[in-house]
Structure formats: C-alpha cells, structure tokens
Amino acid sequence: MRLYLFFISSLLLAESRRSISKISHDEINQHVKTTLSSEGIVRIGHLHPTNPIIAHEPDVLKMCADDLKMRNILPQNYTLTVFTMESCNKYSGVEHAAFLHYLKNASVYFGPGCNNEMLVIGRLAPRWNVPIIAHMSGDDALSDRVQFPTLGSVALTSASEMAKATVTYLNLNNWDQIGIVRPSVGYERLSVYSLQHQIKKRDINLNVILDIEPFSSPEEIISTGKLTTLKSMARIIVVELGMDIHSVTNFMLAIHRSEIKNEEFVFVIPWLAHQNDHYPWEAANVDKQEVKLAFENTIIITAHGYDKKFFDDFQMKFSAVTGVLANHYATLSYMSLYDALFLYGLALRDAFEDGGGYNVHMNGSLIWSRMTNRQFIGMTGQVLMNNKAIRVPSYATYHAINGTLKIVVELEAKNNDRGQCEKNEEMCSEHVAHETIQYYWPSDSGKLPPAVPKCGFTGAECDYRPYFIGASLLAFILTVGPLSYFIYLKQKERLLYDMTWRIPRESIKMLEGKSKSEHSLASKSQSSGSFSGSMNSKQNGLIAAKQAVSNGVKLAIKRYQQVRNITFPKSELRLLKELKICENDNLNKFYGISFNQQNEFIVMWVLCSRGSLEDILFNDELKLGRNFQVSFAKDVVKGLNFLHTSPLLHHGMLCLQNCLVDSNWTVKLTNFATEAVIFEKLDHNELRPFINTDSESADDVSDPTKDFARKKYLQQAPEIIREIVTTKTIPEGSQSADIYALGMVLYQILFRVEPFHERNKSINKLMETLAMANDDDQLIRPTFPSSNTGEGYNLQLLSCIEACWLEIPEMRPPIKKVRTMVNANLKSTGKGSLVDQMMKMMEEYTANLENMVRDRTALLEEAQKQADRLLNSMLPKSIAEDLKIGKPVLPQLYSCATVLFSDIRGFTRISSTSTPLQVVTFLNDMFSGFDAIIAKHDAYKVETIGDAYMIVSGVPTENGNSHAQNIADVALKMRAFICNFKLAHRPEELMMVRIGFHSGPVAAGVVGLAAPRYCLFGDTVNTASRMESTGVANKIQISEGAYNLLHCFFPQFQMVERGKIEVKGKGECLTYYLEGRTGKQ
C-alpha cells in the first residue's frame, strides 16, 4: 500500500511539473524574484477540501492571522497572505500544492484534510523545505520523520497517539493477552496498525487478528464463523474498523446477535471520529434499542480535554465573523485549523527572535524544529506537541451502558524530560491514567475481568469435580440456607438496635470552664500569644461545643433540647453504627449520642486540643511555615479520600471549621455525615436549640440563615447552597459537593485568606449570587491572591483547585485524582518530620515569645505609670500608695493646716452667654494654669466644683508651719495668673477672682469605694470658704489665724487689715488682705 502511494506521488509530482512547465520560464523567474524580494511576507498555502460542511476554512485562517497580529505574536513587519486552492478531489491537492510552491512561493501548507493527498504532499514538502501542518489527518504513517521530516499535526487525535493511549489503558488493567478486530483493507492508517507494534514492546500477547470485510452486515459477519474463533482466543478485544461508525455498529450487532457477549468480554473501541454528538444508536435506519444493547458494557476511547467553554466561545466568534452557525463536527475542524496556524505563528516568532531574520519563514526545517516539544493553550484547549511535532492529545475511556457514556479513566497527556526521550524515543511522551470510577463493571465484584478467564478461553482448564460435590450439597443448602439467613438477619438487626454508640447521660460530666491548655482557641480571653492562637468562640469549629468527660475521655459536645422521645429509622441506625466503627488517622473519632434522658440530646466527638484550622490559619500571630500548610492539605485530602471509599461515602459539610487539629498537629475531619440528620430532627420539632447561660448559640445547624452558619455554608458547592437558600434545609451532600468544598479548604490552607475576600459583599449577597447563578457570566469563584504568586504553587495544582470548583458536579475531579495532584505538587521544604519541624518552630516561637513578653512588659509598665499618674491626680501620693498595696486608710486629725478656696467673679454671667464647649475649654485652660502653680509647691488640690477651686497644704503630709507660706505663695501666683488670663472666645473680657484661706485644725480621710475621694472636714474648711465668699474681686482675704502664722513666721508677706466683717455662723471676724511679699524672710 505504501509503495503504491509512493508510486502515485511520483506520477503526480511529474504531472505537476509538466503542468507548471506550460508556463513560461520568464514568468516563473520574474514571479520568484518578486516574491523573494518581499521580506516578512508569509505566503500560506491552504489546501481546502471540497467538503461543503467545512467551506469556511479561509475565514478561520483570517481570524487566526488577525489574532496573531493583534496579540503581537508575529514580528511587526510580518504579513500573512493566504492562498486557498482545492484539494481531496482526484489528487487535485497535489497539483495545487506544486502550483503554490513554484508560482506563489508558499512558505507553509495547511491541509489537505484527506490522508491520501497528505501522504504525497508530506513527502514533497521537505524537498521544498517548507513545513506542512495537518489539522484533520490522523494516519499512523504521518509520525514517520524519515519520510515526513517537516510535517506537524495538531489533530485532536491521531492513530499513533491513540495506540499509545490504548496500550496505557491495557496496562492499567493488567491485560497481557488481547485480540484485534480490524478491516481487511486500509488498516495501515488506523491505530490498530500502530497498536500491533506498541504491544510488542509492552509484553502484551496478540492472540488473534480478525479481519472484517468492508461494509459487511451483521449476518455476513456471523456467517463467516470468525466470531467463534475470536471467542476461543481472547476476552479483551480491540475493535477498530475505520472512520465509518456504521462498520463498528454492524460488528457489535453481530456480537450481540451471536450471544457470545457477557461480562467476561471487554470490547475496547478506539474512536477516531470526532462527531461526538452522533452516537451509533442515534443514527438513522437502525433499531436504536438494539444498538444500545449491542454497545452496552463496551469501553470507548476518544479524545478528551477540550473545554466546552472554548467550544462555545469559538462558535460565537466564528458566527460573528461569518454569520454562519457551524455544526459540532465543522466547529471542531475549524478550531483545529485555528490551532494549526497559531502553532505556526508561535514557531515563526521563536525562530525570528533567535536571530533568523525576516526571511526565516523560508527555512522550513528551522520553523518545524520550533514546533516540537512545546505546549500552548489553543482553541481546542491545551495543545501538547511532542518531539515529532505531533500533538499528544489527552484521552478518556468511557463505559457505555443503556445509551449513556461515563468517564471511567482519564488518560492525561504528558511530555517527559529530554533524558528519557534520548534513551528511548517512544518515551518522549506518555499518557498518565487517572481512574475516576471503580467497580462499574456488571460483574459480582464490579471489577473488570482478567485477560484470561479462570478456566481458560475454552473452559478446559478447570476441574469440575468440585461442582458435582457442590451440587450434592445444594439441596442441603437450599433447605438450611433460608433458615440460617433468617437467623442472620435477626442477629444483624439485633446488633443494629443494640446502639453501641448510645451513651448514658449519667456517664457524662459537663465541664463548666474551658481549659486554657486544651481549648485556648475557643475564647478571646486567652492570651493571643499562646502557641494555639486565639479566636472568638463564634469563629471556632467547636462553637457551642461545651466540653465534657465520659469514662475518662475528654469530649467536645453539642447539646439540644429534646422535645419528645426520638426513634431512629433503620437508615440512620446504620449510619450511626458506621460512624461509631469508622476510624482513621485523619478522621476525628465519633464518640456517640445521648438521647431520651433529661430532655437532652447530646452529640459527642473526641476533643481535639488545638481547635480548628480556621483558628490556626487566620491567627496572624502564628507564623506557620510552608511545611505545616503542606501537611494540613495532605491530611485533609487523606481524610476525605478515606470517607469517599468508606460506607459513609461522603462528608456532607466539609469546611475549614470542620477540620480540627490535635496535639500532634494532625488534621482530623469532624462532623461528617451528621449535620443533615440533626437538622432533619430540628426541622420536625423533635429537637430545639439548647439555650446556654453564657449566651452562646447551641449550633449553627439549628438555623442555616445565621451569619456564622452562612460563613460555613459559603464554602459549600453551589447545588448545596442553592438548596439551603431556597428551602432553608441542609441536604445530605454528595462526593462531588465534597470535592468543591475541598477546593475551598485547600485554597484557604495555601493562601491563608477567606474565599471571596476580594469581593465587598455581605455573606448573604454572596450566598444568593452563588445560589442563583445560571450563566457563565454570573458564576463567581475565589481568585488566587497576586501577592502569593511567589509561594511556589505550580499551575497544575492551581488548575486542580479550579477544577474542583466547576459548576457541573459530574465534571469535578474524583478524590483520587486530587490526591495524586496534591501529593505530586506539594512537597515539604525542610528536613525531618512534621514533629521535628514543629519543634524547631516552637524554639523559634519561644525566642519570639521572649521579645513579645519584653514588649508586653514595657506596655504594662507604661500603662501602670499612666494609672499611677491618674491615681495621684485623684488622691495624694502617700494615700494612693497605701491604697495600691491594700493598706487601710484611716481618717486622721491634723492640728494645723491651711485651706484655700477661689471663685471666678461673674462666672454665671459668662456661662449663660457661652456654649457648654466654650465653658469647658475656659475652665480647663484656667485650672490647668492653677495645677501648674500647685505642682511647684507643697500643696494638694482637693477638688473643683464648677468654677470653685479648693487647695490644702499640710495634709496628708504635715510640714510644720510651712503650709501657710505655701498657700500664700500659691494665692499670689493664682491672682497674677488670672490678671493676665484671656478667654479664648471673649478676649476682651477682664477676668477677676476671689481668693480666701484660713489656717486651723482639720480632719481628712478617704470616702467611697467605687470612686474614692480624699475629703477634708472641720470648721477650718468652713471658715476658709467664708473667706472666699465674703472677699473682694482680685483680693486675697485671709483669716486672723492665717495672719498670725504669716506674721510670726513669714514676715516677708505684706498684709493689711480689712477690719471686722460679718461671717455667717461666726458673727464678726477680723480679716486681712494679703497684698504681696518682699524678699525678706
């Protein structure tokens, strides 16, 4: 066949040259000179198939050329010119390729879309030193770089890569013996041809090859007797009968009608056709139900990985340009053609930037080399090119059942490093298998069958004597079996109703206080510097959860008021039984439930001492290293992986608050599979929220509309939020919803920010937006912080998290794939175990704590000084010191002290014409001046009442007779201060003050407990007050007792007699005016 094609290509090349020779040599030479002199003009040879379905390929090339120019991928002076000519019509493409080369000087070829012409032009292209890029052809021969050294392909699938993917799937299931069904002619172009070479290198035996004549009907296939041969030699059968879907349909109908198909047979169908919207059972003129049955339990391998959003966006853009809405097949073809030109543009840019100059597009081999070993995001998703410039697509295997295809294994494309490629060219690229579903096969175990049945292909390898013995026992079993089974069910039911998880109320002892060492995260009253951190209890994963002890085990509990007796249905009894026996290093232990006692319903989990991940991650004072984040993320994934493979099946309410940390810094998932049960009983009024005396709510489950509950539910999948918002109920949950929530948890662990922190919306608004979103434009998801781009998290990990947030639940990755991705992309940076890292961090923390203690001590000392200053301003210093040390302050009588009163003349008039703020400002300014004067003397300000000011000297510290001198000096300075004092709001106002003082015995003591005041009592205080009230403005009136002290002991003071005045309660008293003082002592 290949020799025939080579012969045809030689004849066509000769014919092309004869056609071209008809044109004058002068015309050719003149045209070539013109074209070669135009630097930067890239002439594109487009060989357009005659298929009318894809008639708009030239428009697609123009779209891509415009995009390359707009995105500055092409150098500035480059221009793309497209020449479109017919192909795939009696080898017209070969003639037109020659025409484009010799007369148009084409720099690159796109197409043709048919294999026969591609094989010919692909051999001519290296002779002309131009690259040729296929976007539809998938022939196995195209990967031969000896014959096609300048050929590249961006086709969504190819025979060679499909063969590699098929071998990967065979190896995944340990199938080492297979059969192949292929067409009797033309199979060289299919993946089965490449598959025959691939399996020889992978130790897979090919037991049988079945050739089927083209266009054979099911009856004709059965009549050949070949199916009997197939049955006797293979159970794993790879079926590929060309691009025509009807050939495969007829073969599968023959298998179905011959009744040789059962769960021992696996038919693997590599599907090269791209018409994914057209399944065999949707074709016309077929019995759709029979075709569905014929394809049931087949495995279909097809291209996978292009996002539907890319498809829809391209279709809209194409429609806007052409006004045509292309069908599915045409759109995929157009998208591949777009990617082909985009790949060429990238290669051309790289060659130019490497110094190729503006004529670099004439060097086809150099351009081709830049198309190898690279990847980019194209219209069909991620385009991964191997060392042969052939696209390595990702594939998926689908299980067909009842007309529905479900992905069971994803085969992810991957380029290996250059070292592996140099050792073995076949290892330059590979497919990595990710199982998405297990136990789906219709066998008793749900597992896929082995390559060879237990008794061989013909059944001759088994000894059937045990079956005869078994038959003799069958009667006995049929007699005794039902009775035994009935006893077994009764025993199982009894165990179910034993309720090993039920805890007697009398064995539970409530702990009123929360231990600082064990639950410091639950209260703000703890020191924020403790290693466990601190958070408001409303933000703790163990919110309401009081602590209790049962049989020596410390528990976190949630309490509810029980309205009436509770009876659990069997489904809930099974759930609680599984909860009780469920144990894993990354799951918190469910301790049990106490109910139908003391009108209380108590849910108990083992206490985790360090609180929740939310408390730890959002405590800014906790400087956790990357190793802790890596360990936390892996622990959460491991815990969820265990749940998804356990009888519990899912968590139901995964969030950061339900991820607890124990004393060993291991993350344990909690509250799994219980919240929906509790809410159901609250909703049926069997339970009520427990009212705590400390005003904490019982549980956010009781009301999913509360802010805290909404904060937790904000991390749930949109379908869960939708049900919470619309029905105010908590759904049971699912594995796909857990995966969405896992993405949220990983996001918060890695970046230590809350989801949607960048959106200035309330939690209510965010919940409503998530619940009501029904359009791609309305979907909102957290954004990765730009400040964390240097954290070292690669794009694969971030893409995995984004995949967890997909709107359609079925498209989210399974937990096994997420675990593989997390383990591969999250690596610890330090040496030693996490405990070693924790110990090192604690050492650093201890050093940091010393600095923190030093800083806090300094702040405390400063606060103490401020308190002392405030206390000393309220009480005499000696009295304040006694009160601070708890020494009782007893009332005391002083034989002689001097008391002064002052009062502002006209204060009432000034106050009535000023605002309250002006009055306060005025008094503050004046009394601040008085305070400054007192501070320079041995005197104490007792109190101020309005504009009245009271001072004493000689109390509480006695100072002989100096108290009279101190008060006299203060009085003179006060009068001088007032004479120069100006009101800020009435500067023209002349201020005047009355001052009076008296010397005599007084009693003093502290009065009051809440606001203690140091008060003076006695006749001396009354007399001093009368000296002020009967005085004259800007005069200092003193009593006879004060005069005698000053006159005898301090003659420097100048005093004049005023005379006798009437004093209330005293009668006539002789008083004096203090005028001033001289330097005489």
Curated annotation (Swiss-Prot):
Its EC number is 4.6.1.2. It catalyses: GTP = 3',5'-cyclic GMP + diphosphate. The keyword ATP-binding applies. Keywords: ATP-binding, Cell membrane, Cell projection, cGMP biosynthesis, Coiled coil, Glycoprotein, GTP-binding, Lyase, Magnesium, Membrane, Metal-binding, Nucleotide-binding, Receptor, Signal, Transmembrane, Transmembrane helix. GO terms for biological process: calcium-mediated signaling; cellular response to acidic pH; cGMP biosynthetic process; detection of carbon dioxide; detection of chemical stimulus involved in sensory perception; positive regulation of exocytosis; positive regulation of neuronal action potential; receptor guanylyl cyclase signaling pathway. Mg(2+) 2 binds at residues 903-904, 947. Glycans are attached at residues 77, 105, 363, 402. One of its GO terms (cellular component) is non-motile cilium. SUPFAM superfamilies: Nucleotide cyclase (SSF55073), Periplasmic binding protein-like I (SSF53822), Protein kinase-like (PK-like) (SSF56112). InterPro entries: A/G_cyclase, A/G_cyclase_CS, ANF_lig-bd_rcpt, Cyclic_nucleotide_synthase, HNOB_dom_associated, Kinase-like_dom_sf, Nucleotide_cyclase, Peripla_BP_I. Residues 898-1028 form the Guanylate cyclase domain. Mg(2+) 1 binds at residues 903, 947. Guanylate cyclase involved in the production of the second messenger cGMP. Involved in the sensing of CO2 levels and acidity by the BAG neurons. May act as a direct receptor for CO2 and H+. This is Receptor-type guanylate cyclase gcy-9. It is a single-pass type I membrane protein. It comes from Caenorhabditis elegans. The chain crosses the membrane at residues 467-487. Belongs to the adenylyl cyclase class-4/guanylyl cyclase family. Residues 1-21 form the signal peptide. It is an enzyme of class 4 (lyase).
